């Protein structure tokens, strides 16, 4: 990724309301190092009317990471459509990876959960820290 893309991702990270993988946002250097050292299969910045509104990425477990400044059903649908039209899930590996795309959602992100349910997406798992 370019430095501009890393900066835009950092802006989104600072704007994020819900976190899954960390308790507090990383520093700009920590973020830059992470983005450079941990490439996802694909990572897209999402714009609407030339304004940055979020990012989406795919991982090797077929998970889709969606981070939008505000979650709206039409934008979620557009993300799903783009991903499905441009990418195929990796083949399943028993006990490792499904052969379908899925999304991990913070339990606090009730708006996205509601949108997914309205779109007839079904919940397959809940995770708990121990």
Task: Please name every model-derived segment.
Residues 1-11:
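A short beta-loop-alpha structural element at the N-terminal edge
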Residues 10-24:
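Helix-loop element at the rim of GNAT/NAT acetyltransferase active sites that forms part
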Residues 41-54, 59:
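Conserved beta-hairpin
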Residues 59-79, 104:
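Conserved acetyl-CoA binding element of GNAT-fold acetyltransferases
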């Amino acid at each position: 990724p370019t430095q501009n893309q890393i900066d835009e991702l950092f802006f989104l990270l600072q704007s994020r309301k819900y976190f899954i993988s960390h308790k507090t946002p990383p520093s700009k250097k920590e973020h830059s190092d992470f983005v450079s050292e941990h490439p996802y299969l694909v990572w897209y910045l999402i714009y609407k009317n030339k304004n940055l509104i979020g990012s989406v990425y795919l991982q090797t477990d077929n998970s889709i990471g969606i981070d939008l400044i505000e979650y709206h059903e039409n934008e979620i649908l557009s993300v799903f459509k783009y991903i499905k039209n441009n990418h195929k899930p990796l083949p399943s590996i028993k006990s490792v990876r499904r052969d379908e795309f899925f999304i991990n959602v913070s339990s606090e992100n009730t708006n996205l959960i509601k949108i997914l349910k309205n779109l007839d997406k079904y919940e397959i798992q809940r995770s708990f820290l121990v």
